[in-house]
Structures are given as C-alpha cells and as structure tokens.
C-alpha cells in the first residue's frame, strides 16, 4: 500500500499522538537503536 498517502492523511495526528505518548515508546526505541549499534 501507499505509505506516503497514509502519512499525508494521518501524519499530523500521528505526530501529535507520538509527541503525547513518547514516554511509552522512547525507551524501546533507545534499546532497539543501541542493539543495532
């Protein structure tokens, strides 16, 4: 499917949701990035 279209349609809401809930996924992302590095 077209990811670009989805981002255009939901991008702003996704960004707002991400900012609001960043404390939920930030530790996971840090852990994931550290494992990759």
From Swiss-Prot:
Any idea which GO molecular function terms this record carries?
Answer: toxin activity
The residue ranges crossing the membrane are: none
**Keywords, ordered alphabetically:** Disulfide bond, Membrane, Secreted, Target cell membrane, Target membrane, Toxin
What cellular component terms from Gene Ontology apply here? extracellular region; membrane; other organism cell membrane
Q: What superkingdom does the record give? A: Eukaryota
Q: Hey, which family's this protein in?
A: Belongs to the ectatomin family. Ectatomin-Eq subfamily.
Q: What does the subunit comment say?
A: Heterodimer of subunits A and B; disulfide-linked.
Protein name (Swiss-Prot/TrEMBL): U1-ectatotoxin-Eb1a subunit B
Which organism was this protein described from? Ectatomma brunneum
